[in-house]
């Protein structure tokens, strides 16, 4: 049985308990989103790295499935011992974790890129283009972020991981047959949703997001689930053997199609509703908690920071 509907989408409590009857012995792979899921604001924690490496030693494959391009991956993630595959750009590429070699590619169709080029140059929104494993942004946007910051883009992250170019649309035309993903950023939700709906009506592409201020345009067959199916095929597994973790709409395909899905405590409502289980937040190392309690069957998989926070909260409640 895949899931117990009574536990599907249940809100995470201070110590979330899984009440279903899923057979966790069938899990042979863990698929992990990065931002808002595996990473905290300080990156990959020691405890998370140790837990993932322990899972690998136990014979469970660990696969990263992120919206980032390969060049934007933290070194700590690539250095997880035993990690074989990394899915990037929402499924556009699968790379060898040790060498960075691209093993699989499902980029946007050139016709889809042409349709995007008919629209975006007429709009004022910041655009990022993912191609060749790197992320590019217009130089004027890059310099403005460096000088003034932004209320709706992570200036520090963009400045660290993006390459500025003079003409972002010329780059898009030049690489129209190798575009992994196109990110568009918005200050206003009304504009974001209007552009989402506009692109969603067009053929040859998909639209998703990983933050409340962006949309991510990808290939019509590109998704984290499709890339995971490819990885499974290489390992002699199937998607029902996979436990997937995520927090945002670009994780939805793999959460729906994998054997067991885990939403983070900080996930969007639609992701929580789609999941079999809701763990604690990424800042509380919710990936660690879920793996240790569900897969390793430890009685208390709560990371020390989260446990201390809860004891403090209980003490404060007792004083009221």
Over which residues does each language-model region extend?
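Conserved acidic, metal-coordinating active-site core of Asp-based
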Residues: 119, 130-245
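Mg2+-dependent phosphoryl-transfer enzymes with acidic/Ser/Thr/Gly-rich catalytic loops
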Residues: 20-29, 45, 200, 215-320
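Short hydrophobic/aromatic-enriched beta-strand-loop microsegments
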Residues: 83-89, 149, 207-208, 261-265, ...
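Non-catalytic pre-domain segments flanking phosphatase-related domains
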Residues: 1-32, 57, 316-320
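Short, acidic loop-to-helix structural element flanking the phosphoryl-transfer center
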Residues: 43-60, 105-112, 165-169, 221-233, ...
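Active-site phosphate-binding/coordination module
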Residues: 46-152
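Short active-site oxyanion
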Residues: 59-63, 82-84, 181, 240-241, ...
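Active-site metal-binding loops of divalent metal-dependent hydrolases
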Residues: 36, 68, 91, 246-248
């Amino acid at each position: 049985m895949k899931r117990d509907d009574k536990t599907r989408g249940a809100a995470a409590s201070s110590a979330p308990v899984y009440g279903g009857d899923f057979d966790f012995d069938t899990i042979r792979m863990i698929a992990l989103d990065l931002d808002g899921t595996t990473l905290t604001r300080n990156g990959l924690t020691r405890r998370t790295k140790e837990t993932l490496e322990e899972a690998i030693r136990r014979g469970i494959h660990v696969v990263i499935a992120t919206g980032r391009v390969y060049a934007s991956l933290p070194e700590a993630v690539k250095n997880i011992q035993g990690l074989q595959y990394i899915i990037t750009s929402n499924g556009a590429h699968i790379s060898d974790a040790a060498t960075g070699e691209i093993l699989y590619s499902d980029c946007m169709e050139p016709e889809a890129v042409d349709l995007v080029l008919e629209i975006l140059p007429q709009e004022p929104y910041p655009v990022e283009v993912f191609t060749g494993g790197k992320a590019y942004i217009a130089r004027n946007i890059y310099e403005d972020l460096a000088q003034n910051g932004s209320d709706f883009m992570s200036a520090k992250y963009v400045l660290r991981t993006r390459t500025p170019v003079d003409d972002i649309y010329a780059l898009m035309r030049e690489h129209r047959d190798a575009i992994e993903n196109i990110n568009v950023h918005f200050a206003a939700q009304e504009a974001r949703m209007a552009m989402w709906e506009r692109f969603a009506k067009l053929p040859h592409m998909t639209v998703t997001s990983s933050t409340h201020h962006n949309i991510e345009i990808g290939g019509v067959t590109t998704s984290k689930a499709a890339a995971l199916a490819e990885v499974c095929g290489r390992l002699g597994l199937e998607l029902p053997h996979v436990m997937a973790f995520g927090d945002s709409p670009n994780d939805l395909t793999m959460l729906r199609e994998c054997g067991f899905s885990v939403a983070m405590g900080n996930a969007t409502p639609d992701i929580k509703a789609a999941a079999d289980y809701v763990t604690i937040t990424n800042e509380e190392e919710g990936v660690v908690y879920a793996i240790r309690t569900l897969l390793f069957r430890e009685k208390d998989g709560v990371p020390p920071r989260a446990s201390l926070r809860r004891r403090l909260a209980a003490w404060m409640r007792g004083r009221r």
